[in-house]
Structure formats: C-alpha cells, structure tokens
Curated annotation (Swiss-Prot):
Its main location: cytoplasm. Binds 2 [4Fe-4S] clusters. One cluster is coordinated with 3 cysteines and an exchangeable S-adenosyl-L-methionine. It catalyses: N(6)-dimethylallyladenosine(37) in tRNA + (sulfur carrier)-SH + AH2 + 2 S-adenosyl-L-methionine = 2-methylsulfanyl-N(6)-dimethylallyladenosine(37) in tRNA + (sulfur carrier)-H + 5'-deoxyadenosine + L-methionine + A + S-adenosyl-L-homocysteine + 2 H(+). Gene3D superfamilies: Methylthiotransferase, N-terminal domain, tm_1862 like domain. SUPFAM superfamilies: Radical SAM enzymes. It is an enzyme of class 2 (transferase). Its cofactor is [4Fe-4S] cluster. This is tRNA-2-methylthio-N(6)-dimethylallyladenosine synthase. GO terms for molecular function: 4 iron, 4 sulfur cluster binding; metal ion binding; N6-isopentenyladenosine methylthiotransferase activity. Residues 141-374 form the Radical SAM core domain. Belongs to the methylthiotransferase family. MiaB subfamily. Catalyzes the methylthiolation of N6-(dimethylallyl)adenosine (i(6)A), leading to the formation of 2-methylthio-N6-(dimethylallyl)adenosine (ms(2)i(6)A) at position 37 in tRNAs that read codons beginning with uridine. It comes from Anaplasma phagocytophilum (strain HZ). Keywords: 4Fe-4S, Cytoplasm, Iron, Iron-sulfur, Metal-binding, S-adenosyl-L-methionine, Transferase, tRNA processing.
Length: 444
C-alpha cells in the first residue's frame, strides 16, 4: 500500500533539488507525494539556514504540523537548520522523529525503518562517502521543462558571514558520468533547460575516465545531449572563473549569456573582513572578461550591507561598483550575524538604522538598473522557454527568457503548440519585474 509523503522545502536551488532527491529515494520504499500534510504518513521539513531567523521559522512550522498531522505520522527535519541545530531540535520539539543533515539524505530510508523501532534518529555526519556516491539518481520526480541538476556541493571558501561550509561541508564534485546520465533521464522526460547547481558551482572539478573536468568542459558535454536546448549554472564565485568557462560562453550557443556572480561589497576593506579572497578590481576584471566572451552577457549579484565595520566610504565604494557594472538584477540584504561564523564575533556592528538606510539606497540603484535592462529588451527577438498549460492565464502564456526574466506573452490561436518548448518571441515592453511580448514562431 502506498503511503503519503509531504515535503515542505525552503531556501536555495539546492534545497529544491534535495527535495526531489528525497522524493525519489522514498518512492521505492512505498511513499508517494501528497499535497496536504494532513494526508501524509511522513511530513518532511527541508530547511535553509542562510536567512535570518531560520530556526524560528522551523519551530513555527513544526508547531503547525504537530497540530494537523496524523497521530502515527513520522515528522522529519532535514537540511541546513537540521545540521546546525542537531540534537537541539529534539529538545525544543520532542515530537520530531528524525533529524538529518544535507549530507545524510541518502540514509533516509534506513532512518525511517529504524525510527519505527527506536523512535528517534539523527544523522548530521559529513560522511567519507558522499551522498552522490551513495545513491543512484533516478529522476522519477518530474523536473519540468526546466530542471536543476546538482554537480557540486559544499564550500571551502569560509566567508566570515556564511554558514554553508558548516552545514553543507567541504567542496565535493560529482562524477561526470552520473551527471550526464541524470541529464539524459530529464531530457527523455521532456526537460529542455538544464540548470547546473552547486554552492560554488564553478569550482567544479569532476572526473571522467580518469581525467579531471572543469565546469566549462562539462557544459560542452552536456550541450551535446539530445533534447538539451538551454544550459545555465549557479552560483559562482569570482575566484573560480576559469578560462574554459569564458570559452564556453564564447562558443556554446546553448549556454545562457547570464551569470549570477555574488560580490557582496565593493570595498576592499570589507571584502578582506568577509574573507572573500578577491578585491573589487579583480571582480571587475572577471565581469569584463565575461562581457568580452559574449556581447549579450548580463550579470546578477548578491550584496550585504552593514557588515561589521562598514563605513559610509565603504558603502559608497559598493555603490560605485554597482554603477560600474550595471546589473540585470540583484539581491541585497542587511547583514545579520549567523551563530558559529567569525562575523558574529566581530566588533563594530553597524546600527540597524544605518543598515536600513544603506539598503534602501542600494536597492533604489539596483531597481533602476533592472528597469533599464528590461527596457533595453524592447524590440529584441529572443527564444523563450514556456512551461506547461498551467502557465496560461486567459489570453496570455508565461515563459522565462535567457536572463531569467518572466515574460507575459500574448497567446495566439493554437497556443497549445507553445507549451513545454522554446518559443520565438518579440519583446514589446520592458517592465520593472517582467517583459511583455508576442509569439513569432516556435524556436525549434
């Protein structure tokens, strides 16, 4: 008899991928996804520790699930908060049955079997054998017209504001053949866009027949798989932009001319305190090389304002860098200390009102740049990836550009031919957060 599995997942692209992996892992032992926690025999909360108050969000969610779950339902906490909190989850929420960190997800079937005998199970180890090596991916969970494929996990950079090295562990690159097999499984099910993901994705150094491959070479190989029409990758670190990656952007037409390249600050003094391992000038050189590799290149980034010790001069240098690059879109946040990170122990914490004022100024500039970029799309013809019929509203369908912009497309008669494929679209209007266009023809 099939039992119900309800997964509630927060956070980054890797968590989306991990949730699909867990669904695939539990299917062979008799669990299938359900849409309501009330109907589940397992409720799994897949957590993220990047943003502020992540733990409070978890315990609030657990309290809600405790009230509505079935009496015999197994309650599981997975992900980065599980890794960081460990046994403390059981102390604050004794009704939780399983705590499992990101590197122990492949042990879920075993933990669930054990919990029926021993009530509580925990696995927050960083194993010698990676979860990528411990399981064989079988992508039964539908990835859709666009799907994530994890190629790298963990981080060795140890930025002083970041919990990732402590919750995801050291950098590990997945075997090339396993990646290619997963991409083939996805394209066989109709996926058109492959998004290669990792905490530090351009640090990828997998192996293929005894030889080491970097991300640029992997992209070239993925592009040869039948059915792949667009390739993206995220998230990148400025220190790991290798020559082969610039070459891939120059030569590989299926690779989107868009890179998410976090910089965090434009001040060298703050970049040193953050342990970012690059200067503002080095970041700008990477940007220049990317733009030289493809005339259509655009970038997005992440920024933290109010890092300990940030002066008004430091912040002005960040604004100067933003003006110099001209980002297509970006994400900006006020610094908030993460327990266990060096930054949490720094003196010279910036007052909240100063953080708020700087964030407003930075977001104002980034918003202006985003609108300018979207307006620059007017009159262009581009290939747009359109999802399934659920993306249709009245006389419009919705798609994603090669720059990840949402596009509202006037739907012609016979628009059912547009779904789950690449469509040729003329952009008529650029708005703040989206584009508007009209279908010309299918791209393929």
């Amino acid at each position: 008899m099939t039992r119900g599995l309800y997964i509630e997942s927060y956070g980054c692209q890797m968590n989306v991928y991990d949730a699909l992996m867990m669904e695939d892992l539990l299917r062979p032992v008799g669990y299938a996804a359900v849409s309501r926690p009330e109907d589940a025999d397992i409720i799994l909360i897949n957590t993220c520790h990047i943003r502020e108050k992540a733990s409070e969000k978890l315990y609030s969610t657990l309290g809600r699930m405790r009230v509505i779950k079935k009496e015999e339902c197994i309650l599981i906490v997975a992900g980065c908060v599980a890794q960081a909190e460990g046994e403390a989850v059981f102390e604050r929420a004794p009704y939780v049955n399983v705590v499992v960190g990101p590197q122990g997800l492949h042990t879920l079937p075993e933990l669930i079997m054990k919990v029926k005998r021993d009530k509580k199970q925990i696995n927050i180890e960083f194993p010698v054998v990676s979860k990528f090596d411990a399981i064989s991916i079988d992508r039964k969970a539908n990835g859709g017209v666009s799907a994530y494929v994890s190629i790298q996990e963990g981080c060795d950079k140890f930025c002083t504001f970041c919990v990732v090295p402590y919750t995801r562990g050291p950098e590990y690159s997945r075997d090339v053949e396993a990646i290619l097999e997963e991409v083939k499984q996805l394209t066989d099910r109709g996926t058109k866009e492959i998004v290669l993901i990792g905490q530090n994705v351009n640090a990828y150094h997998g192996t293929y027949k005894g030889n080491e491959w970097d991300l640029g070479k992997l992209i070239q190989k993925v592009s040869l798989i039948d059915g792949v029409e667009r390739i993206r990758y995220t998230t990148s670190h400025p220190r790991d932009m290798h020559p082969s990656l610039y070459e891939a952007h120059r030569d590989e037409k299926k690779l989107a001319p868009f890179v998410h390249l976090p910089v965090q600050s434009g001040s060298d003094a703050i970049l040193r305190k953050m342990n970012r391992k690059h200067t503002a000038e080095e970041y700008l050189r990477v940007v220049e090389q990317l733009k030289d590799s493809n005339k259509n290149m655009a970038l997005s980034s992440d920024f933290i304002v109010g890092f300990p010790g940030e002066t008004e001069k430091d912040f002005e240098e960040t604004m100067k860098l933003v003006e110099s690059v001209g980002f297509a879109l970006s994400y900006s946040f006020k610094y908030s200390p993460r327990p266990g990170t060096p930054g949490a122990e720094y003196s010279n914490q910036v007052p909240e009102e100063e953080k708020s004022a700087r964030l407003a100024a930075l977001q104002g500039l980034l918003t202006k740049q985003q609108l300018q970029f979207n307006k620059s799309m007017e009159g262009r013809v581009m290939d747009v990836l359109v999802g399934d019929p659920s993306s249709m509203r009245s006389d419009r369908i919705f798609g994603k550009s090669e720059y990840t912009q949402s596009i509202h497309i006037s739907a012609p008669s016979g628009s059912e031919d547009c779904f789950n494929r690449m469509v040729r679209v003329e952009i008529l209007h650029g708005r703040q957060n989206s584009l508007e266009g009209t279908v010309l023809s299918n791209a393929n």
